[in-house]
Amino acid sequence: MQSTAPHRPPQPSRLALYLDLIRWSRPAGWLLLLWPTLSALWIAAGGFPGWHLLAVFTLGTILMRSAGCCVNDVADRDFDRHVKRTAQRPVTSGAVSVREALGVGAVLALVSFGLVLTTNAATIAWSLPALAVTIAYPFAKRFVSMPQAVLGVAFSMGIPMAFTAVGGAVPMLAAWLVLGNLCWVLAYDTEYAMVDRDDDLKIGMKTSAITLGRHDVPAVMAFYLAFVALWAWALAPFGLGWPLHAVLAAMLLQVAWHWRLIRHRTREGCFRAFTGNHWLGFTLFAGIVAGFALR
């Protein structure tokens, strides 16, 4: 006699849940953080920075972004259950407890700090405010009308750290690169916020998409153009030649493509624009690498 008990799908392992927690299958997030960090590392070193620093900043970027996901999901768990896109995240659904998520985040942050300890005192010092901003960002969405600016600071901390790791100090050049990167984060994370705008309005979440209102698309385009212009201006003295010029042209074409994706403000178009942003960062990084190699 066959059992009539309903079939239950196999439950995911703890490892699978932790990988989902840190968005392991969705690398676009850490790539957005990685490309400007590596670009700054190449600029600071005047070319290839060596395998040690390349490994430290690549692994550190992935680890800290993953730790940030843990903190973010704990902080947003009561909001995420009301948003279609985030309702099934491990912490929100109860598959991973708050204590577990914070534990995973702490381990990842400690491993990342261990990597920083192999650099120098200045870089270690800069890692502390970097950690503080990473923790603060999820809570900024409750109080700041443009929390994407706080994320922009968090996602730009690798730039001064790259300069201190190479030269022990942060030149004025790094400030211009940070400002440009901040504009880029404002552009792509506003696209991201446009995806969830209807849900965020219902639950009282503050985002740049809500703050900008009907000016969101022009503002995103202005942020993109400011990003390209600031990095082009900062890189001009290095004489990177045709690779940089070609890359800047390619970046402007990508910006135009983003306008086509978001101009009607559809969820699908805005999300596609956001997830495709890592190609913009990779394009810039590739131009910088080629420019220094051929200089």
Curated annotation (Swiss-Prot):
Membrane-spanning residues: 28-48, 51-71, 101-121, 124-144, 159-179, 220-240, 242-262, 274-294
Broad EC category: transferase
Pfam families (UniProt xref): UbiA (PF01040)
MF terms (GO), sorted A to Z: 4-hydroxybenzoate polyprenyltransferase activity
Reaction(s) this enzyme catalyzes, per UniProt: all-trans-octaprenyl diphosphate + 4-hydroxybenzoate = 4-hydroxy-3-(all-trans-octaprenyl)benzoate + diphosphate
InterPro entries (UniProt xref): HB_polyprenyltransferase-like, Prenyltransferase, UbiA_prenyltransferase, UbiA_prenylTrfase_CS, UbiA_sf
GO cellular component annotations of the record: plasma membrane
Membrane topology: Multi-pass membrane protein
GO terms of biological process kind: ubiquinone biosynthetic process
Enzyme Commission (EC) number: 2.5.1.39
Role summary: Catalyzes the prenylation of para-hydroxybenzoate (PHB) with an all-trans polyprenyl group. Mediates the second step in the final reaction sequence of ubiquinone-8 (UQ-8) biosynthesis, which is the condensation of the polyisoprenoid side chain with PHB, generating the first membrane-bound Q intermediate 3-octaprenyl-4-hydroxybenzoate.
Family: Belongs to the UbiA prenyltransferase family.
HAMAP family attached to this UniProt entry: UbiA (MF_01635)
Protein name: 4-hydroxybenzoate octaprenyltransferase
Gene this protein is translated from: ubiA
